[in-house]
Each structure stands twice: as C-alpha cells, then as structure tokens.
Amino acid sequence: MGTVLSLSPSYRKATLFEDGAATVGHYTAVQNSKNAKDKNLKRHSIISVLPWKRIVAVSAKKKNSKKAQPNSSYQSNIAHLNNENLKKSLSCANLSTFAQPPPAQPPAPPASQLSGSQTGVSSSVKKAPHPAITSAGTPKRVIVQASTSELLRCLGEFLCRRCYRLKHLSPTDPVLWLRSVDRSLLLQGWQDQGFITPANVVFLYMLCRDVISSEVGSDHELQAVLLTCLYLSYSYMGNEISYPLKPFLVESCKEAFWDRCLSVINLMSSKMLQINADPHYFTQVFSDLKNESGQEDKKRLLLGLDR
C-alpha cells in the first residue's frame, strides 16, 4: 500500500546538536558580514567627508592667494616706482651739484705787494665797505610821548600865536573852554569817561590848524570856531553816536553853527580819514603839536635878545 519513512528522534536531535556549532558560526558570520558592511559604509562616509574638507581648505587657500597676489604685485610696483624715483632724484641732485661749481676765489696778491715795507711799494688792495643792512625804503620809527596837559598847553600857545590880534588872550583860555565842555558832558551823563586825551587833542589840533584864521577879531569868535571843531572831534572820535549841541553853542543862531560844521567837513574830510588810517601822518601831526611850545620859547628868546 505504501511505505512509511520513520526517523528516530535521537538521530534528529543528534544532527541538530551536531549542526548547532555550524549554525551559530553561520549566524555570527552573517552578523560579522553585516557589521563589516556597516563599517565599510561608515568608513566610506568618513573618507568622503575628509576629502571634502580638504578640498574646501585648498580652495580657500587658493582664493586667499589670488587675493593676496594683486596686493603683493601692487606693493611690489610701488616699491619699484619708489626706487626709480629715488634713483632719479639722486641723479638730479648729482647733476645740480655738478652744474654749480664752487665760486672761484680771487688770486692771492703776490709777495711783493704783501711785503710793501721791504720793497717800498704800498699795497693796492683795499677792502670794500660793507653795505648798510637797513633799507632806505622803510621809514624810521619815531616815538613821541606827551601828556594831555602838555598837549593842551601847546594848543593854547598855538592859538595865541595864530590869533595875534587878540592881545588879551592867554594860552589857558582855550584850555578852559575845552575842559568846561568835557566836564558838562560828563555831569549830564552823555559820556562815561573824559574825551580830552592826547590822541583827541592831536585830532583837534589838526582841525584848528587849517580852520582857524589869523584874522579872528574877538575871543567870542575864536571860542565859537574852536567849539565847532571840538564838536566835530566828538562826532568823529567819540564813543557815543550823538552829542547835544548846547554845550558847544556860544551863540543863539544854530544855522551859523551848522554852516561852520559843513565848511569844516568839506575842507578837512580827507585829512580826518588820513589821520586814522596812516599812523605816520598821526605821528607827524603829534610832533608838530609838541613843537608848538618850542616855537614860543624861541620867540621869547629872540625878544629878550632884541631888548
């Protein structure tokens, strides 16, 4: 009917036991092969990363070298140009020194001229005089000093000589007229300090010298003209914008006062500007005013000699 194949259980167990080592070895072999594949994959990934880093580093170095090359070439060009310019400057300096030879010294005189006492012949060599250091174009600096009272006295003496018809006029009278006006303006508050200073007296003298005539017939006329010149001096040299007319008026008619002011301005406008712009002109007028007292002393000396 059929055959029955029977296997003994001991044999099967034996075979399983006998093959047990082989199956474990096969399992370990499979596991080792898997691990080897994983290790190979890891090694490949590490190997692939390392060359990429090296490539990036190499490319960065190349870029830096490319950037550094133009700078280095530029610096080398600058250094080369500097060297060339230095060589040219040295050559030009050598040429300039060569083109300018040292000045030739004059020949020494012969021994016969030097020993003039022995041969009886005097030496003909003479030293030229040294030129003056100061140039003739620059004007000399003149320093003139005087006090206010001294200049006022000189002004009074000048007015007494100019107005020779006024027999009773003394040098102190014009000074008193000027002082009274200055004091009244101080008391009324029109000025903070006195106007009568050496510079302002010099300015007033410049006006009086050209304005006041020698044909003045009275003290009142002289006072009117003198105070007109003083008002213009205040207006031109004073610190305030305007001053009142009352201290300067000695007559009731203001039109006559303004007419005199206009005539003085038309006559002395250029000199009034010059005395402030030109210090030499101011010094000259200052010296002229100071010399007015010396003329009075000379006149008195001549009168004493005539007697």
Curated annotation (Swiss-Prot):
Stretches of Polar residues bias are at: 112-125
Q: Where is this site: Cleavage?
A: F98, A99
Q: Describe PTMs of this protein.
A: The p35 form is proteolytically cleaved by calpain, giving rise to the p25 form. P35 has a 5 to 10 fold shorter half-life compared to p25. The conversion results in deregulation of the CDK5 kinase: p25/CDK5 kinase displays an increased and altered tau phosphorylation in comparison to the p35/CDK5 kinase in vivo. Myristoylated. A proper myristoylation signal is essential for the proper distribution of p35.
Q: Which UniProt keywords apply?
A: Biological rhythms, Cell membrane, Cell projection, Cytoplasm, Lipoprotein, Membrane, Myristate, Nucleus, Phosphoprotein, Ubl conjugation
Is this entry keyworded Thylakoid?
no
Q: In which tissues is it expressed?
A: Brain and neuron specific.
Q: Name one GO molecular function term.
A: kinase activity
Could you tell me which residues carry Phosphothreonine? Answer: T138
Q: Does the keyword Cytoplasm apply?
A: yes
Annotated region described as Disordered, given as residue ranges? 97-133
Q: Which GO terms describe its cellular component?
A: axon; contractile muscle fiber; cyclin-dependent protein kinase holoenzyme complex; cytoplasm; dendrite; dendritic spine; growth cone; membrane
Q: Where is the lipid attached (N-myristoyl glycine)?
A: G2
Q: Bias category Pro residues: which stretches?
A: 100-110
Tell me which Gene3D superfamilies the record gives.
Cyclin-like (1.10.472.10)
Per the UniProt entry, the effect of T138E is: Decreased susceptibility to calpain cleavage
Write down the SUPFAM superfamilies for this protein, in alphabetical order. Cyclin-like
* Record-listed Phosphoserine modification sites: S8
What Pfam families does the annotation carry?
CDK5_activator
Summarizing the function annotation, the protein's role is:
p35 is a neuron specific activator of CDK5. The complex p35/CDK5 is required for neurite outgrowth and cortical lamination. Involved in dendritic spine morphogenesis by mediating the EFNA1-EPHA4 signaling. Activator of TPKII. The complex p35/CDK5 participates in the regulation of the circadian clock by modulating the function of CLOCK protein: phosphorylates CLOCK at 'Thr-451' and 'Thr-461' and regulates the transcriptional activity of the CLOCK-BMAL1 heterodimer in association with altered stability and subcellular distribution.
On subunit structure and binding partners, the annotation says:
Heterodimer composed of a catalytic subunit CDK5 and a regulatory subunit CDK5R1 (p25) and macromolecular complex composed of at least CDK5, CDK5R1 (p35) and CDK5RAP1 or CDK5RAP2 or CDK5RAP3. Only the heterodimer shows kinase activity. Interacts with EPHA4 and NGEF; may mediate the activation of NGEF by EPHA4. Interacts with RASGRF2. The complex p35/CDK5 interacts with CLOCK.
Protein family according to the UniProt entry: Belongs to the cyclin-dependent kinase 5 activator family.
Q: What is this protein called?
A: Cyclin-dependent kinase 5 activator 1
- Species the sequence originates in: Rattus norvegicus
